Structures are given as C-alpha cells and as structure tokens.
Amino acid sequence: MKKLIFLRVFGCFIFSFAAFSAANANPAPGQEKFTVKEVPAFSYCCLPCQGPYTNMETKIGELTQFLQAQNIAPMGPLIGIFYNDPNVTKPENLNWEIGFPVMESNVQDPLRFRQWTFTTVLEGTYTGPYEKSAGIYAEMMGWLEANGYAPAGPILEKYLSDPNSTRPEDYKTEIWIPCRKK
C-alpha cells in the first residue's frame, strides 16, 4: 500500500520534469560529462533518516503520507541528500534525507523544512538502476580532484524518472556534489 501511494504521488510530480530530464540526460558531443555550475538556493521539506539506504522505499512511503497529512505540495522532483560516504560509514550510521522542494514553511514533525544553500556544485547525470550507481560517485570525486576542486557539502540526488513508467535501466538521476576551488 505504501509503495502504491508513493508511486502515484511520485509519478504526478515526475511528469512535469520529464522534458527537463530528457534534455539533460546525456552530454552532446564535445560537452563535459560533468559540469561545475551555479544553482539557486531552494527550500525543501524532508524526512530525516538514519540507517541503510535499503530503507529508502519505506521512507519515501512515509514521506508521502506525511506530506499528504500536512497538505504540503511538492514543487519539484523527489530529492535525496546524503551526508556520509557508505564506503566508510556503517549502514546503520548513515544519515540522509528524502524530500521535495517546497514553498511552504509550516512543516510539522517528523518532517523538517530546510534550505539548500550550496550554490556551486559539480553536476552529473546517472542513467540506470539506483543500486548500481556507485561508480558515478567515484568518477565525480576523481573529476573534482583532477580539476582542483574539493567537495564542500552533502551529495544531492534528483530523481528524474517515473518508476511507474520507466524501466530501472532507464532511470535518470541528476547528482549534485557541492564543491569549492582548492
């Protein structure tokens, strides 16, 4: 039931972003795979989470129920914000958030209203099943190092595909790694 609720809510918001994700899915010939860019700060509503990422589906279901109960309208695609490196942090100690950009600030427990203030990011797009995305993070971290940048905040993922109508191998995820020049 929770999965069905999530999939319906998630699907409604994803369709408005389909054109954006299609236009930015793959770099054109001659373009970089990763780009350092300035992005606007934004507000988001999230459910803070601790534990393994395998809990994400359950947490998304909880998030959508809390959003509905509080009449909070998402203003963009589902996002995940990740504070730890799963290669060095035990799964039970991982801190992360799952949420949506929002306009409202009247958010009640257990949800939190937060500001994304990291405006310089390295952006990359991953296509494929979520559980096989680890390689792009190593590539992005390597790109930062090779180009004189250092990570400067938590990783943000924007989920641009509708899981109701998209095969896992075609899922598109936009990834932001906040960064600064060394």
Task: Please tell me what each predicted stretch does.
Residues M1-G11:
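Bacterial N-terminal signal peptides that target proteins for export
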